[in-house]
Amino acid sequence: TEITGILNGTTNFILTKMREEGSSFEDTLKEAQRLGYAERDPSADIDGFDTSRKTAILLSMISGNRCRHEDIYTEGIRNVSDIDMAYAKALGYSIKLLGSVQTVEDKYFAYVAPMMVEEQDPLYPVNGVYNGIRIVGNCLGTTMLYGMGAGKLPTASAVVSDIIAAVRHKSNFQGIGWSDKMIEIEPMGGNA
């Protein structure tokens, strides 16, 4: 079983613009801030911590146990250069910041890192402020979830939607929960 995704619209916007326009990381980050996609202090996004937190939530949901995002190998996009993007593009790849959770024989593996994604991967065409999650399961096969992941309106809409759902169904609301048992994440062995 594997869940791998582009979980941060801000970083995906930055990487998409760098790939499409050949612009530098710094210039693209400034544009993302001007458009309201990146915070004034973008560290949580560009250093991978937002994606790491979301990856920890996904791992907690599938395992039923707690996962600390600090336990997940995390590398952001701060060091991805326009030269890296040009090489990836020339080879037919796109660089995406991925959060990934894999289970193998009751062991859990997780990482967050910029990775080269090939054209045949369903995550390849996920561009701009969009997020995408690829889920691979034994019975399910491969499926994708896709939607906007950055900007004031998508964020506000998601928060308001959650509040309304909780209020409407408060009498029978059952949140997703997990035990207090902590997950042990296996080292990736240099894969990330």
Regions found by a protein language model. Give the residues of each.
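Oxidoreductase and adenylate-handling cofactor-binding alpha/beta cores
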Residues: 1, 14-18, 22-23, 53-67, ...
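Catalytic, metal-anchored helix/loop core of enzyme active sites in primary metabolism
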Residues: 2-4, 12-15, 31, 36-40, ...
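Substrate-binding/catalytic subdomain of NAD(P)-dependent oxidoreductase enzymes
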Residues: 28-125, 130-132
